[in-house]
Amino acid sequence: MKGSLVSDVFLTGEELANKVRKLLSGRDVRAAVAFIGIDYASALEEMLGKGGKVVCDVSMGATNARALDAIRKKYPNSIRKVHGMHAKVIVGASESLVSSANLSRNALGLTEQPGRLVEAGLLLNKESEGFRRLEDWFDSLFLSGEP
């Protein structure tokens, strides 16, 4: 487990929200999130336009289905639905984040206003065993999801 704990970072509040936004703006990002709010639809669309993939749950009604359907028409092979998805994981090129935060205004706020919920997350670097396990987990989950 070389390096698995050396540079892991615990994030909360605005620091967490900023890291989520930064990760989503990268290339080939993979995100598994329970819910995607309407305020984060454009960030999701931008992420998918850069080769990203997303897994989410639409069955509980918290993800904006109309926004997701519009994005799916543009990127049909980049979105998968998994019933019961409750994890919040973002895998970037050099960092991965496991957190409590959905992609929503309540959780992360917007750039000019903070979120209303108390959220926390753990950032893992690419050298950690956890990072590699998250990559494998996401890829397996994506393959098993419904288009």
Please give the residue ranges for each predicted region.
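General small-molecule cofactor/ligand-binding pocket signal
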Residues: N77-V82
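Short beta-strand scaffold segments in enzyme catalytic cores
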Residues: H86-V91, A120-L122
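Short beta-alpha junction loops
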Residues: D57-A62, M85, E127-E129
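Signature of lipid phosphatidyltransferase scaffolds
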Residues: D8-V9, G13, V98-P147
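Short hydrophobic-aromatic micro-motifs
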Residues: I90-G92, S96-S99
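Primarily the HKD phosphodiesterase
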Residues: V6-Y75
